[in-house]
């Protein structure tokens, strides 16, 4: 049989080669190649993916695993990762939460980084500490991250030394352990708002070691376990045979490997090997479960399924990737199917894959429809009918998305032609390599060549068949390891299991004709029109005034009030950048019509050059539109291209033809969002957010009544008025183009834009101003545990002047205040998990700034903690808390985060317009001004904020 198959393959190849000599029609050639490819699928599936040869990996005599990969990127940074097998599932009953507790203690002092030196070292390297950005504990592992560190040799050595300390030399003083207990409690408190989501995940895991244990642990254990219990857990499991060191970045791999061997080689091998992760419990029939959600007014019907294990293909082969890609594709197909079922009763649809626990082979898929609570039966039945119909009948060619990309194959299409990527530094980003390596260590999988793996995935995606999709779907929805989850708003009574089961049973008994949804042709959105297909022949405007500013720049004021700026500047490929900015934006809409701001782009769109699409972008205080033209030669085609671009400007700016289908979709989305926002807890949260503002009308979502009044008819009225005046608009033409030659076209298409006697202007509303008196507000909400979300807003508007130096001071204030808050109310007092500090400033609509501090805490301590925060801010302004080291850390962080500047035309053109319209250009990454910040200048800036601004304190609390 094998010989016959090989002979048949050879014959096919000969036929194909002969045909290629005779006929070179590309379409026929592609068809023949596709036929050959499908004939050889079984052979390609067995092809082994080459192992990676670029990662230096090994295991020391003591059992510690290391991975080092040189990976050059423009930022020249290095990512360090310390991995430990065994998360919360290896805890004993009296240790629930200790694995996570140990993770916290790694930042409270080690042998070579005592006290707070670990956090201080990270700060000096520009790395922020807090939340899960530096470490996190999972069910089966713990990870410590030192990402984007400088490739300085001293920093590299220090990072390796810190990871060595984490491996065996954490100090864990009794005093530090006691101070960290409440921090963990506060972290747990902040997560309880998502408790119902965790309960839903547990239904999929359905295994005691995962359901009964959670990484954050039991708070009774966290509060009362002895320091000895914590230290014993650390010594028992933090042993070399359970650990790995990963270094990826701009380093010399050989040098780093040598340093790892020297630094970690003398650690003693332990006796405690983390056992394999327990297998999940299997259920042969679906389970029906009910949950309450206090954050949504909607009901959700969901089918949650654990993906079947796939043991058919040999690991490390191309075929081993097929199941993964089939299910990924299946998820996308189901999203399309469910989205097509949305109507007045079904307001939400979702299809997604998830990995609830970091265990190899455990993945889930969810299909979900949302409705109003009274329509729960309709939602469940619709979902069940669609799933049952597809289970019986499978997918069609129309359902399957076509993938155009194929990898390269060998000449006879019997194998993928894998490119040689040996020792290629620039293949893949640091994060991609770290993820690949981490999975290899925890799951025991081999490291495969990254480019070859992606080529294999391309092959799989391009050869997925409807039969494979249908078979995978049937296995997925056969009822095994499936949960039917019905989630209702808090306070709504659950139906019975029998009611749900009866609906599912009735659907199973339906005939195909009953299962098939009546197909109604969806209304179509307006098609984009080519500008040459539209009669565009406006009456040209005239020149009112010409001003020559210098040899490169001249300004021309047109009769309709548009100012045209010609900037003679040589761009690549004879490029011409044209950019229009109207200084109005949707600030012109009244409070009552503000919700239509999201629909102003729902108009007929135009294109030129067959593929160039663009639309007017309505922003809060500007309406912008820009295009770029280029040509190898300044010939007739060059000028045709420029005229078509200018036609695009005219057509796009003047059309009032509303796309009613697109607008209706946004209106429906807005109405659903209004219903979602009607929940008491959401409204309370929004009121706290709006506390500093004079008015919340343009900041809060619309009410259900307001959203119900939205209409396409009113949008049409607004669009006609909104695009009726371009007096005061700036139009920039940048490029090496002759002004006299292009002027007639500019007069015809820009000079003819509609205008009114008065130029446009930016409007101010109540929501654009901060309150001028201090305020305090308390809002109540429900939560499974006592919780208070506190927000302190320091605002300054009257007398505030914004320039680049002030922006640098605001950036520094955010960094320094954030560090001091972390040190004071988390590290020293243990009152909160991680406070967040954000400083924002605005030039428009009025110069102003806001310093927002937020955190979660125990409701009974909210006033005391808020007073501590206020006292800290006052001490910063009056004392010596702002040190040079804190400012230096801020500057290093700015340098680390700054992206390399890419020369181009967009930046200079935007700067010119911003300077012309706003009088100043403000950058977010001006290191020159950042480096001018000093402790004294920052202190003086904060004093002004406290003296001239106001303070607004909001508590969102359960009691």
Predicted segment positions?
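His/Glu-rich zincin catalytic helix
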Residues: 5, 20-120, 158-161, 165, ...
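Charge-rich, well-structured scaffold segments of protease-associated domains
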Residues: 20-36, 59, 120-274, 301, ...
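Hydrophobic alpha-helical membrane context
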Residues: 14-15, 112, 198-199
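Bacterial Sec-dependent N-terminal signal peptides
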Residues: 1-23
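A ubiquitous, low-specificity "background" feature that marks scattered single residues
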Residues: 8-9, 106, 201
């Amino acid at each position: 049989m094998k010989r016959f198959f090989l002979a048949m393959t050879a014959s096919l190849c000969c036929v194909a080669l002969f045909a290629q000599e005779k006929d070179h029609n590309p379409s026929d050639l592609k068809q023949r190649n596709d036929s050959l490819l499908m004939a050889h699928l079984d052979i390609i599936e067995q092809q082994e993916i080459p192992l990676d040869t670029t990662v230096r990996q090994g295991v020391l005599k003591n059992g510690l695993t290391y991975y080092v990969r040189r990976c050059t990127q423009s930022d020249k940074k290095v990512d360090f990762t310390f991995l430990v097998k065994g998360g919360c599932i290896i805890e004993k009953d009296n240790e629930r939460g200790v694995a996570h507790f140990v993770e916290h203690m790694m930042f409270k002092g080690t042998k070579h980084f005592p006290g707070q030196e670990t956090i201080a070292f990270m700060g000096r390297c520009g790395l922020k500490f807090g939340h899960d950005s530096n470490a996190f504990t999972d069910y089966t592992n713990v990870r410590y991250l030192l990402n984007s560190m400088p490739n300085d040799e001293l920093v590299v050595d220090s990072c390796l030394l810190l990871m060595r300390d984490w491996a065996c030399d954490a100090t864990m003083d009794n005093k530090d352990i006691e101070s960290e207990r409440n921090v963990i409690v506060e972290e747990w408190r902040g997560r309880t708002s998502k408790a119902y989501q965790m309960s839903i995940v547990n239904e999929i895991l359905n295994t005691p070691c995962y359901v009964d244990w959670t990484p954050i642990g039991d708070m009774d254990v966290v509060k009362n376990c002895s320091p000895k219990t914590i230290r014993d857990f650390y010594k028992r499991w933090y042993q070399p045979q359970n650990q790995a060191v990963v270094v990826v970045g701009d380093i010399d791999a050989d040098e780093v490997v040598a340093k790892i061997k020297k630094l970690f080689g003398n650690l003693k091998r332990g006796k405690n090997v983390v056992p394999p992760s327990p297998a999940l419990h299997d259920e042969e029939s679906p389970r029906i479960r009910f949950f309450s959600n206090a954050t949504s007014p909607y009901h959700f019907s969901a089918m949650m399924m654990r993906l079947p294990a796939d043991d058919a293909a040999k690991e490390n082969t191309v075929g081993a990737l097929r199941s993964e890609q089939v299910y990924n594709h299946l998820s996308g197909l189901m999203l399309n199917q469910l989205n097509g079922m949305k109507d007045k009763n079904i307001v939400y649809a979702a299809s997604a894959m998830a990995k609830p626990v970091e265990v190899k082979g455990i993945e889930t898929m969810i299909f979900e429809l949302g409705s109003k609570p009274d329509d729960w039966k309709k939602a469940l039945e619709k979902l069940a009918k669609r799933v049952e119909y597809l289970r019986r009948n499978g997918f069609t060619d129309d359902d399957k998305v076509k993938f155009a990309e194929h990898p390269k194959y060998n000449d006879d299409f019997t194998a993928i032609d894998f490119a040689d990527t040996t020792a290629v530094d620039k293949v893949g980003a640091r994060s991609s390599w770290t993820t690949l390596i981490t999975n290899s260590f925890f799951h025991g999988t081999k490291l495969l060549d990254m480019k070859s793996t992606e080529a294999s995935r391309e092959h799989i995606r391009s050869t997925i068949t409807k039969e494979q999709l249908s078979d995978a779907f049937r296995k997925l929805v056969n009822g095994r390891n499936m949960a039917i989850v019905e989630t209702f708003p808090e306070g709504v009574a659950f139906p019975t299991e029998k009611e749900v089961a009866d609906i599912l049973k009735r659907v199973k008994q339906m005939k195909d004709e009953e299962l098939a949804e009546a197909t109604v042709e969806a209304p179509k959105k307006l098609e984009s029109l080519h500008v040459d297909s539209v009669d565009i022949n406006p009456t040209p405007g005239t020149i009112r005034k010409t001003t020559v500013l210098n040899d490169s720049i001249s300004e021309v004021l047109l009769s309709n009030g548009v100012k045209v700026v010609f900037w003679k500047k040589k761009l690549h490929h004879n490029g011409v950048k044209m950019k229009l900015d109207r200084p109005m934006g949707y600030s012109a809409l009244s409070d009552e019509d503000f919700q239509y701001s999201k629909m102003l782009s729902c108009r007929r769109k135009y294109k030129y050059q067959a593929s160039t699409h663009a639309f007017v972008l309505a922003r809060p205080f500007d309406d912008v539109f820009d295009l770029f033209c280029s040509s190898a030669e300044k010939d007739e085609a060059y000028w045709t291209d420029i005229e078509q671009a200018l036609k695009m400007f005219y057509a796009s700016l003047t059309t009032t033809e509303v796309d009613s289908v697109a607008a209706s979709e946004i209106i429906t989305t807005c109405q659903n969002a209004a219903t979602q926002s009607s929940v008491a807890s959401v409204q309370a949260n929004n009121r706290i957010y709006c506390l500093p503002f004079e008015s919340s009308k343009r900041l809060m979502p619309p009410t259900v009544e307001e959203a119900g009044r939205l209409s396409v008819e009113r949008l049409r009225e607004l669009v006609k008025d909104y695009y009726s005046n371009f007096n005061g608009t700036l139009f920039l033409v940048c490029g090496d183009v002759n002004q006299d030659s292009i002027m007639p076209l500019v007069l015809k298409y820009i000079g003819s834009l509609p205008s009114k006697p008065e130029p446009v202007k930016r409007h101010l509303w109540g929501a654009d101003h901060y309150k001028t008196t201090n305020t305090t507000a308390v809002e109540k909400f429900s939560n499974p545990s006592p919780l208070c979300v506190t927000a302190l807003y320091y605002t300054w508007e009257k007398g505030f002047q914004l320039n680049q130096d002030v922006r640098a001071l605001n950036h520094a204030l955010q960094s320094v205040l954030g560090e001091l808050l972390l040190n004071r109310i988390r590290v020293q007092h243990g009152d909160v998990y991680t406070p967040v500090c954000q400083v924002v400033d605005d030039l428009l609509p009025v110069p102003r700034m806001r310093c927002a501090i937020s955190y979660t805490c125990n409701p009974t301590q909210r006033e005391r903690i808020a007073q501590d925060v206020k006292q800290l801010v006052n001490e910063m302004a009056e004392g010596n808390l702002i040190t040079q080291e804190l400012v230096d850390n801020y500057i290093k962080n700015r340098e680390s985060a700054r992206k390399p500047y890419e020369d181009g035309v967009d930046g200079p053109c935007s700067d010119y317009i911003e300077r012309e319209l706003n009088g100043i250009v403000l950058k977010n990454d001006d290191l020159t001004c950042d480096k001018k910040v000093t402790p004294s200048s920052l202190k003086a800036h904060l004093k002004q904020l406290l003296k001239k601004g106001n303070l607004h304190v909001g508590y969102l609390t359960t009691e």
